[in-house]
């Protein structure tokens, strides 16, 4: 997520919505030509499986599901542009590549092949390699148990750092487009900041994999989104080692997407969103209705060991992709 403080400014929300619809592709849509080019893509170890042009065209576009663009307001009337989006399929492609490699490397057949090849070469029996390899019966490894080590692991870490930088550029590009089109400026009262989840934290103290969690180091500013009606919590991390220096990345769902669509109505959705300007409240986004998520009060009570809640910022505008 990316948080951009705007200060006490007046925003024409209808115009804001027009800009988002016109200049920010969303869901499965991307730009026809690149708005920005991320030069580090050429450094990916798995570059042959990446469509670089498509990845560059996706910079400055919003993902689907729970990804969003919001204008939020605090109790002092200060506005915030908040953008929740990630690596736009690039990360998925990279992860799928290394997952398949892990499954291959972890099969007994692959390990035995290496051992046999090295052994026969050392004994000067290279002519027997093909015969011996044909005798091996590979064993498949369940996806969840496959792993990588050595050079392949280093390549994976290297590529994931690039993907995470790409995701950051994507969010910043969307913010730049919106602010430039509307003539809005960043308030210096609070520095813009990113809060990232579902990523690998390559910190100096070691590697931490955070799934459904965000970094909450001592004194670190972060945002925890609740839902499209109640907004987000601006927090400061407590650096609690018992919580792995982390906090939850959001409220979490009370209902699955399927259950939300089955049990909630668009009328209910519309009623609870009546104080938020949004052209995204419809059947297509019903699974993102506020009622599908855990209540904010319960989350605030549960996260006291991880962060100090500094303020609640509430949406006055929300946009989600209609997938």
Name every feature range the model reports, one short phrase each.
Residues 1-31, 40-323:
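Domain-length cofactor-binding catalytic modules of enzymes
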């Amino acid at each position: 997520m990316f948080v951009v403080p705007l200060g006490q400014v007046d925003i024409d929300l209808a115009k804001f919505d027009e800009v988002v619809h016109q200049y920010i592709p969303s869901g499965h849509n991307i730009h026809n030509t690149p708005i920005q080019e991320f030069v580090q893509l050429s450094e990916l170890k798995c570059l042959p499986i990446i469509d670089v042009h498509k990845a560059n065209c996706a910079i400055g576009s919003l993902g689907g599901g729970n990804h969003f663009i919001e204008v939020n307001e605090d109790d002092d009337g200060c506005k915030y542009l908040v953008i929740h989006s990630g690596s736009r399929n690039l990360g998925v492609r990279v992860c799928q590549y290394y997952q398949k490699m892990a499954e291959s490397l972890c099969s007994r057949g692959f390990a035995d092949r290496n051992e046999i090849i090295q052994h026969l070469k050392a004994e000067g029996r290279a002519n027997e390699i093909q015969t011996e390899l044909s005798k091996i019966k590979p064993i498949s490894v369940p996806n969840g148990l496959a792993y990588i080590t050595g050079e392949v692991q280093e390549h994976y870490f290297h590529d994931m750092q690039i993907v995470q930088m790409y995701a950051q550029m994507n969010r910043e590009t969307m913010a730049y487009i919106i602010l430039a089109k509307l003539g809005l400026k960043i308030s210096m009262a609070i520095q813009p900041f990113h809060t990232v989840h579902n990523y690998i934290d390559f910190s100096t103290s070691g590697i931490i994999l955070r799934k459904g969690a965000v970094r909450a180091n001592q004194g670190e500013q972060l945002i925890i989104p609740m839902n499209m009606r109640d907004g987000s919590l601006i927090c400061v991390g407590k650096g609690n080692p018992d919580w792995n220096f982390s906090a939850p990345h959001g409220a979490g769902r009370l209902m699955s997407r399927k259950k939300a669509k089955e049990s909630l109505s668009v009328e209910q959705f519309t009623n609870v969103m009546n104080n938020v300007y949004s052209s995204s409240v419809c059947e297509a986004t019903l699974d993102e209705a506020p009622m599908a998520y855990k209540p904010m009060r319960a989350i605030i009570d549960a996260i006291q060991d991880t962060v100090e809640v500094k303020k609640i910022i509430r949406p006055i505008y929300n946009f989600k992709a209609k997938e």
